[in-house]
């Protein structure tokens, strides 16, 4: 009895053969079973030594028991399940559009309104400062005419070229100085706007007088004074610009009338 050593994955195992001299005899493998295709050997394999032949068979058997797998051709994973459909999705979509349209309209309205208010404020400021019909321009023109009048210089005791202080009518409290100038604009029968204004002027030596004037707005860019009068305590009324004949002009009195003036016919 001869012994044949075989190499396998679990170590060396001893196999027995009844006739080692004959290659064609049956080889008993207690662990591995050899397929019939391994027994059919070519003439070249028969001429090999028994040990080499057995090793060749075992290696061939071990090679064919390895399987290789690849994911290259594997099918794609199934798609995720679809979320359940909302029955109110269409209504929510319409409501969302309405909400967005309302928000856009409200924002646009606010922007347009703010822009309109800004334009109005700017136009009022510009007209007040630069247009001839503005109160500020009228006030400044009247003060300059009074400063150039000789009768006003004598009554207020100031020299030519000196500036006068001009401000709103002072109340009983002499500490109050920066009161706004009183003015009102009305439309008369001639269809033109008439601006009536009253303010106070004061020289550096403390002498003061009350100015009353009326201005006619022929147009936005063309104005003219109807009259300008100056009342200084202890002096007769001084007309910087003479009013038309029999023109009703306000007279300084007890202050019971509009703008603190008493209205009545002109007196010489």
UniProtKB/Swiss-Prot annotation:
Principal localisation: mitochondrion
Location of this chain's protein in the cell: Mitochondrion inner membrane
InterPro entries reported for this sequence: Tim21, Tim21_IMS_sf
UniProt keyword NADP, yes or no: no
Parts of the chain on the Mitochondrial intermembrane side: 127-268
Disordered: annotated segments: 66-89
Pfam families: TIM21
Statement: the UniProt record of this protein carries the keyword DNA repair: no
Entry keyword set: Membrane, Mitochondrion, Mitochondrion inner membrane, Protein transport, Transit peptide, Translocation, Transmembrane, Transmembrane helix, Transport
Assembly, per entry: Component of the TIM23 complex, at least composed of TIM23, TIM17, TIM50 and TIM21.
Similarity field: Belongs to the TIM21 family.
Name of the protein described by the UniProt record: Mitochondrial import inner membrane translocase subunit TIM21
Gene: TIM21
């Amino acid at each position: 009895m001869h012994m044949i050593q075989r190499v396998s994955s679990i170590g060396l195992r001893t196999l027995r053969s009844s006739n080692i001299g004959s290659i064609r005899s049956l080889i008993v493998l207690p662990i591995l079973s050899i397929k019939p295709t391994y027994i059919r050997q070519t003439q070249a394999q028969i001429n090999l030594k028994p040990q080499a032949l057995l090793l060749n068979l075992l290696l061939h058997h071990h090679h064919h028991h390895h399987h290789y797998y690849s994911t290259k051709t594997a099918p794609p994973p199934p798609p995720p399940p679809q979320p359940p459909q909302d029955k109110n999705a269409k209504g929510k979509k319409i409501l969302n559009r309405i909400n967005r349209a309302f928000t856009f309209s409200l924002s646009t309205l606010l922007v347009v309104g703010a822009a309109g208010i800004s334009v109005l404020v700017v136009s009022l400021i510009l007209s007040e400062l630069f247009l001839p019909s503005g109160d500020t321009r009228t006030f400044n023109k009247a003060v300059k005419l009074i400063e150039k009048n000789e009768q006003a210089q004598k009554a207020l005791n100031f020299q030519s070229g000196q500036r006068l202080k001009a401000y709103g009518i002072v109340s009983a409290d002499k500490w109050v100085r920066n009161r706004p100038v009183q003015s009102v604009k009305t439309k008369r029968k001639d269809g033109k706007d008439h601006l009536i204004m009253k303010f106070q002027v004061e020289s550096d030596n403390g002498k003061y007088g009350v100015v009353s004037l009326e201005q006619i707005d022929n147009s936005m860019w063309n104005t003219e004074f109807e009259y300008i009068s100056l009342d200084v305590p202890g002096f007769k009324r001084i007309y910087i610009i003479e009013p038309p004949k029999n023109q009703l002009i306000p007279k300084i009195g007890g202050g019971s009338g509009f703008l603190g003036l008493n209205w009545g016919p002109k007196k010489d």
